[in-house]
C-alpha cells in the first residue's frame, strides 16, 4: 500500500520545508523506494504563471507543461525525478474543480461546503499523485504556516487521511524555527511549542519535528521539545544552516530521520546507500577553481527568480572542479557607457528569461558587448530573442528592430507571436508550455554540447523568431542550430565567428541535476573557464 508523508511548517515561512521534503525523498529513493512528491500552495491563484517573480520567485515548468512552484525544482534536482501537473496543487485549482463539478450537477443538488467537498477534492489530489506514478511513498509539502487561514482546508484534509487509510500509512513532519537571541545568548523553544500546540489543536500530532537553527541544539533542548510536543526525543531533528543545500540529506541521515520514517510506516527497506551523494558533497566543498558569470536580469533583487539558472551554473561548475560565482547585474542599469564597468570583470555573460519591456535595452547592450568582445554568452528564452534583435540592429543595420511584444509598431518584428497565439486573450496557462523536441544541426556548438540529433527541452513562451528574417541573418553569420523537427520554429541560435555564443528559446536550466549538468550550461561554463585562462 502507498504510504503518505505530510510536511508542514510553523513559526515563520521560508524555513526550508521544501529542502527537507526533497532531502527525505532522496534518502527514501536510495533505500529502493519509488518516491513521488508534491506541493500544496494555499493561494487562490490557479498557478503561479501570472504572478510576479517578486511575489513568488521563479515559475518551474514540468515536462507536461504545468507552471508550478519553485520547490518542484528542488524536488527534481534532489530526487532526480521528472514531476507532472499533479505535483503542484493550489487553492485556486481545488475551488475551480469543485465549482466546475457543481455546475455539471455532480453534487446532486447538495449544498457545496468546505467539508466535505473541498477537503475531499484535496484528498483526491493526494491519492491521484500516488496512483499516477505507482509510488511507494508520496511526500506532500503544505505551503504556508500553521495558523494561516488559507491553510486550514489542507490541514483538515491531511488530518482525515490518517482516519481514512490508517495511522501506519501516514506520517506528519513539522518544520519549525528555534530562534537564537544574540543579546541573551539563548535559543528559545517556545515558538516551536506553540506551533505544535496549534497543529495539535487542528487534530494533527506530528511524528517528527525538524527544527531550523543557526546554532547546535543541545540534548536538553531536544528532551524539552520532546516532552512538550509529545514525541520521541530521537524524532527531534536538527536542521542547522548548511554550507551547501546538497549536504542536508546527509545531515538528516546522520540523525536517522529516514529510519524513523521507515519504522513508523512499517517499511523494511535496507539503509540508503549515499556513497555517490557523499562524493558529490565532498566535491562541492572542495572546488579548486573559480569563474565569474554576469547574470543580466531585471529581478536580480530577488535571486529566487532565477534559482534554477543559478543551480544549473553550479552543476556545470562541479564538472570542472569550479566554483561559479554569479555577478548580479540589474539590466535597467546597463548602458553603452557603463557596460564595460558592469560586466568587464566576468568570464561569461548570461541573459535569462523574462517578460515585458523593462530592462530590455540594458540586456541588448550586454549582449552586444558579449558578441563584439568574444565573451562566452548563453541566452535563455527572452535572452535568445534579444540576441536575435541585437544582431538585426547592429549587424544587419535594421534600425528599430524589436519584438512585437515590446513594440507592437516596430518596423522589423524580429520576434513575433506564435501563429496559434494570435487570438488568445487569457494570460494564464496559454503559453507554449512543456517538453518539445528540438532538431540540431551538425557541426554547431549546440550539437557539440548534446552530441545528439534530436533533444527534448521544456518551454515557456508566447513569442518566437520571425522566419521572414532568417535568410538575411544566415547570410550575415547568424546560425540557426536548433529548430522544431519541421524546421518551422527556431529553438537555438549561435554565431559563426565567436568562440561560444549560444541562445535557446527553451529553458535548459529546468532539467539540470547536480550529478548530471545540462549540456548547454556545461559547455557555457567550459567556454567561460577557457576565456578566463586566456586573459
Curated annotation (Swiss-Prot):
Superkingdom assignment: Bacteria
Record-listed CTP binding positions: 13, 148-150, 188-193, 224
Regulation: Allosterically activated by GTP, when glutamine is the substrate; GTP has no effect on the reaction when ammonia is the substrate. The allosteric effector GTP functions by stabilizing the protein conformation that binds the tetrahedral intermediate(s) formed during glutamine hydrolysis. Inhibited by the product CTP, via allosteric rather than competitive inhibition.
Region (Amidoligase domain): 1-267
Binding annotation for UTP: 13, 188-193, 224
UniProt key word Cytoplasm: no
A GO term, aspect molecular function: identical protein binding
Keywords for this protein: ATP-binding, Glutamine amidotransferase, Ligase, Magnesium, Metal-binding, Nucleotide-binding, Pyrimidine biosynthesis
EC number: 6.3.4.2
Gene3D superfamilies documented for this protein: 3.40.50.880, P-loop containing nucleotide triphosphate hydrolases
A Gene Ontology biological process term: 'de novo' CTP biosynthetic process
Oligomeric and partner information: Homotetramer.
Misc: CTPSs have evolved a hybrid strategy for distinguishing between UTP and CTP. The overlapping regions of the product feedback inhibitory and substrate sites recognize a common feature in both compounds, the triphosphate moiety. To differentiate isosteric substrate and product pyrimidine rings, an additional pocket far from the expected kinase/ligase catalytic site, specifically recognizes the cytosine and ribose portions of the product inhibitor.
Protein name: CTP synthase
Lineage, highest ranks first: Bacteria, Bacillati, Bacillota, Bacilli, Bacillales
